[in-house]
Amino acid sequence: MTGRSIDAILAEARTRLRRLGPHESAAAHRSGALLVDIRPVAQRAEHGGIPGALVIERNVLEWRLDPRADSRLPEADFGLRVIVYCQEGYTSSLAAAALQDLGLTEATDLDGGYVAWRAAGLPTHDDVRPTVDQAATTPPPHPAR
């Protein structure tokens, strides 16, 4: 048998992170950290989201936040403080470690994910926000006639 288990990969990823709890994440976000929701649309539709979070689905995260990528977002910068969250805090740990691999040394994740945020009584919303890719390609509404 070759390779490592997902549990081993997750444990290794987390050794590199200083994971933030919900209240620490909220304070960091208020201080300018980028809060990034990487959950798929079905989870966001069912459970809601966090006001002010940027929605970047997991499959394009590295391309949007790598400062060297042609498809990067304007916010992408090596000094950017990024807090990634998923539903329960597993996928977000892997994603934050991947961002660190790209050189975003301030990347981390929300310990416990959206579930922990909501349980802490922090603000949430129930509407489904577009991803950064959808927002960039959605034409503005037509003016009323």
Name what the model sees in each region.
Residues 85-86:
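Short, surface-exposed ligand- or partner-binding patches at beta-edge/loop junctions that are enriched
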Residues 1-34, 41-81, 90-145:
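Rhodanese-like catalytic fold shared by cysteine-dependent sulfurtransferases
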